[in-house]
Amino acid sequence: MNSYTHLLRVVFFLLVAAPGLVIGQTDEGQTAPDFRLQDQNGDWHALSDFSGQWLVVYFYPRADTPGCTTQGCSFRDNIYAFRGVGADVVGISTDPVDRQKAFSDKYSLPFPILSDESGDVARRYGVLIERGEMNFARRETFLISPDGQIARHYQNVNPDTHTQIVLDDLMALSADGDPS
């Protein structure tokens, strides 16, 4: 078994078989935890940069793995629909900047892919899975309202259908004028 296959098995275990190892919790209606992280191009982004607009923050376990690629490409393919209703998208994982850059370039992802190597942001959002030296973010998404509140928290995400669910919710919330 090569090391990549072993890593994928460990990631699978952490995400499916060991959900109790997640640290923290963030609920709908709460103020979204702040962040300041570097993207795939070395630029810094903070939650406050997106103040006044809807923001989709999706966490994923590891760049350029099958589910994460499906999810990232789905957000890419629907980015104009998100922007059409006044929303932006950011992806966050514990991968280093260079891995985020390779992932973003390979799939032409048109939004910030943020590096949370320390796992601090994932921890504050309650999605960090810690297993010794290996930290991963659980695949979860937060829809943050223009006033910085968590309007929706998506758990048990299916990468094949998730983007459309988030977009449908965003369109309904935007149409209602309801920030939460």
Question: What spans do the regions from the language model cover?
Answer:
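Structural microenvironment flanking redox-active thiols in thiol-disulfide oxidoreductases
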Residues: 67-109, 117-121
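Short loop/turn microsegments at loop-to-beta-strand junctions
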Residues: 32-33, 54, 138-140
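A short beta-strand-turn-helix
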Residues: 35-54
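Short active-site neighborhood of thiol/selenol oxidoreductases, capturing the structured segment around
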Residues: 48-69, 75
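Thiol-/selenol-based redox modules, centered on thioredoxin-like
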Residues: 136-180
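N-proximal helix/coil linker or "cap" segments that precede and/or mark the start of modular domains
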Residues: 4-34, 178-180
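Short, acidic, Ser/Thr-enriched surface-loop or helix-capping motifs
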Residues: 26, 39-40, 144-145
